[in-house]
Amino acid sequence: MTTLTAQQIACVYAWLAQLFSRELDDEQLTQIASAQMAEWFSLLKSEPPLAAAVNELENCIATLTVRDDARLELAADFCGLFLMTDKQAALPYASAYKQDEQEIKRLLVEAGMETSGNFNEPADHLAIYLELLSHLHFSLGEGTVPARRIDSLRQKTLTALWQWLPEFVVRCRQYDSFGFYAALSQLLLVLVESDHQNR
């Protein structure tokens, strides 16, 4: 990626981690439709690989603002997609896609991190991968740890995530009838792909 700084990419990962970790509350719902978010989306669209995915997400958000009981409907979408059985869902866990659930634990140890006791989900949850990527991008921007070491860990994390993220996105698109989480997952997919290619 050329125009976004390491800190900006870190913020995108942290934002996506938050949205995939729990249902949106009223404040978050107001925030994603705000003028401030529109500016942020405009910045993201300056990155050509992200433009189409951001446009799709903005269209979903515009539709969301006129949806009756938007928060409750989104909560139902979140629950149906991420908390139910895997028959008609997109479970946000590496282990749901036959991946090694211990890999993220090894990566966290290597980064000197651990999961928070406040997050009551298994360590192989998508949000943990995204928080780790956010942390690594912030670290790149700070310059306190050798960039080569951080970049190596970033590439390992991206590779581990890429093993199952495309299938997760397909399932989001298949089972999210409204499309908000499908659009969000598509943005994540192109972000990870661009980040992975930016060695």
Curated annotation (Swiss-Prot):
Top-rank taxon: Bacteria
KW Cell membrane (keyword) present: no
A GO CC term assigned to this protein in UniProt: cytoplasm
Subcellular compartments: Cytoplasm
Keyword line: Chaperone, Cytoplasm
Keyword rRNA-binding: no
GO BP annotations, alphabetical order: protein complex oligomerization; protein folding
HAMAP family referenced in this protein's UniProt entry, alphabetically: TorD
Role played: Involved in the biogenesis of TorA. Acts on TorA before the insertion of the molybdenum cofactor and, as a result, probably favors a conformation of the apoenzyme that is competent for acquiring the cofactor.
Family statement: Belongs to the TorD/DmsD family. TorD subfamily.
NCBIfam families per record: PRK04976.1 (NF003442)
The protein's name in its UniProt record: Chaperone protein TorD
Gene designation: torD
